[in-house]
């Protein structure tokens, strides 16, 4: 028996796929655990089984800047496809800066899960682009060079032949 915070689970839980666990047990894993890897895995599964909970809890993790940039990226990836606008609005409302790792993941996730046609139909898409540009400008030259190919792909995917292009 392994104990992590107040949630206890058998080693057999680790041997079983999370897909086999009931929603209630997955929620319990998220609510009562401090192991970010276990929480992330449970959240990924909940994004299929209980979308409403996953979105609500994922937003909470992102707003509170929970754990580290890797965890935030995993949570973002899990919930972005559930409700793009709500998740992007959450990112806009964050009071903390976005770590480079997380920023690159946001761009990558948007490229993968948001066709251009869908993106331009999002009500606040110009605000999201401005927000991303603002954060991009905060990175130093080495960090910008680290993501040069990603920025090119992002601009191509979202047809950014506007002032955004000159800034990126």
Annotated model-derived regions:
Residues 17-30, 51-63, 84-95, 116-133, ...:
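Amphipathic alpha-helical scaffolding segments comprising HEAT/armadillo-like alpha-solenoid repeats
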Residues 2-18, 28-31, 37-51, 60, ...:
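Structural detector for internal amphipathic alpha-helices that build alpha-solenoid repeat scaffolds
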């Amino acid at each position: 028996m392994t104990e992590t915070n107040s949630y206890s689970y058998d080693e057999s839980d680790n041997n079983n796929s999370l897909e086999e666990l009931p929603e209630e047990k997955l929620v319990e894993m998220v609510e009562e655990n401090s192991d970010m890897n276990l929480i992330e895995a449970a959240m990924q599964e909940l994004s299929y089984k209980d979308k409403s909970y996953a979105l609500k809890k994922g937003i909470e993790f992102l707003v509170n800047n929970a754990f580290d940039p890797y965890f935030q990226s995993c949570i973002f990836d899990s919930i972005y496809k559930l409700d793009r606008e709500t998740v992007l609005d959450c990112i806009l409302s964050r009071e903390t800066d976005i770590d480079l790792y997380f920023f690159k993941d946001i761009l990558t996730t948007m490229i993968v899960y948001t066709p251009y046609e869908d993106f331009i139909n999002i009500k606040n898409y110009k605000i999201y682009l401005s927000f991303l540009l603002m954060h991009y400008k905060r990175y130093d030259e080495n960090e910008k060079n680290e993501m040069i190919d990603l920025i090119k792909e992002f601009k191509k995917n979202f047809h950014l032949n506007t002032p955004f292009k000159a800034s990126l």
